Each structure stands twice: as C-alpha cells, then as structure tokens.
Amino acid sequence: MIKNKFMALTLTVALTAGMLSGCGSSEKAKDRDAYRQYGINCIENGSYDDAVDAFQKALDQSVGSVGAEELDICYYKAKAQYLSGDVDGAIDTYTAIIDYNKDSDAYYLRGCIYFAKNDSDKGMKDFKTALSENDDNYELYLGVYETLSKYGMNDQGKEYLDKALKLKAKTADDYMQRGRIYTMLGDYDSAIKSLQKAIDEKLVKANYYMGEAYQKQGDNDSSQKYFKKYLDSGEADSYDLMNMGQAQMDNGNYDTAITYFQTALDLESVPNKQQITKAMIIAYEYSGDFATAKSQMEEYMKEYPDDEDAAREYQFLETR
C-alpha cells in the first residue's frame, strides 16, 4: 500500500478556499479527530456519501496552518469521493494536495483514477511524475505495474518492475519488495531467496509474501506455513486476511478461507468489510452450506441494499 507522506509548507490560496485548513484549538482538534473516525467507520460500512461529509466537517474544524492530520483526512476524503462515484471530486481533492506539496502518492492515486476514467495519457503522466518525485520507492513501481496490468498494459507494466529491480536493496523492506516483484514476474526461486533475506532480518510482513510466492508456485503446504506465521504475529490487517482467504478459495479450501475472512471481520478496523463479507458468503456457498450463505446474504442486503449483484445472488440462494 502506498504510504502517505506529509510536508509542512505554507497554505496556498486554492487550499484555503475550503479544501484544506490547519490545526486549531484542542477542542476543535478533538472534534476533527471524531469526525475523521466517523468518516472511516462510514467507509467500512459502505456509507461513502456520509464519509465524505464527515471528512469535510473534520477539515472544517481546522484553523491556521496545515499539518499531517489535515492531509491525512484529505486522502481519506478523496478515497470516499471515489468510492461514492464522485470521481471528479476525488481528482479535485488529489489535485489540491498536489498543488500544496507535490506529494508522489497523490500523483500516483490521481493517476489511478485517470486510468479508471479511460484517460491513460493523463494517468501515465501522473505515474511518471510520481516516480520522478520518488524514484527509489519500490511500492510506487509495484503500484504502477498493477494498475497498468489491470488495464491491459502488462508489457509496459513489466518495464517498471524491471526498473525497480535495478535499484539496490539496502533494507529488509527493500528485499521484501524485490521478492514481491520477482513473484509478479514468475521468478519464484529469486522471490523466495529475496524474501528469506527479509525474514532473516525479522521483517514479519515478509512471511505473508513468502506464502504468496509458494501459493503461486503451487506449493500449498509451504504457503499455509508462512501464512500461519504471519497470522500468528498479529500484524495481519483485513486486506492481508482477505487475500489469504482468496488464495484458499482458489485452491478449493473453503473452510480455511472462511476462517481467514471471519478473522478479518473480527478486527477493530475493517475498511474492506463489504468485500470480505461478500467473499465469505461465496465461500459458504461453494462449500455447500447454502443455509449459512443465505442467512448471511440476508444480513448483507440489509447493510448494503444498493448492491445489485448481491440481490441477484440472493435470488439464486433462495432457490437452493
């Protein structure tokens, strides 16, 4: 995941017009943080319009200079805008961040949205700018590859992976990211060697990617061994657990997949709750437990009534 980076700079006129503003009194800071948390909760529950409103109210609490908290809220606001269908609003928010501090993450994320709008020229321009601002960031190269691959530009995406491999690994995280790249390129031996270096340096997250490399290689036993190590560490987030569950789905291990999905839903923070809940329902269905699948789908439809695909799936489950 691309990580937010923040810079303490002077506020521009465009941002003071309401997009961004700074920290105020301690009371306003508490209100800001409360609105921020409420917005995050709304995203987790699929209430994206409410999330946008909450993040804007959080920003409205600020008076003075911009800090990391305000920029963090703007990133959340842009995410909520995109998820709500307000693509242009999300672009405007990322543009405001870019105008403020030229952050490479904002360029990258705006580029992703341009690709979603079928504007690959603007998307590529933003990707190139992001990498020019931060050309030693493995995660940026990986993100660019994944986006290009998603939109049918796999060969161009691989060029960015090759560029990333020309960087010199200096840290355990670097070795882990290189392992991810080798996995994407199908060079599993190199991936395992690189990931082992990261594991030897006590980077727990590398166990997850080691499990992924073995899973891609078809070695499910070794994959489970490393996934379990990562799960036992307590560091797995809901995205990791969903991916581990999906890997088990691919191998037909539906009960294990359900365990991963449920573990994810039991976490304190589950920003991808809707996707996990839906995946778990499918896992129950594939396992043959149609009664549980139907029961959970009923609860899902109450929480996410606008999901038309789920409504069609529910009609199918009613016939089982």
Task: Give, region by region, the residue ranges found by the protein language model.
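Register position in tetratricopeptide repeats
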Residues: 44-45, 83, 116-117, 150-151, ...
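Canonical tetratricopeptide repeat
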Residues: 37, 69-72, 76, 83, ...
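Structural marker of alpha-solenoid helical repeat scaffolds
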Residues: 61, 65, 99-100, 133, ...
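Start-of-helix register in tetratricopeptide repeats
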Residues: 33, 67-72, 105, 139, ...
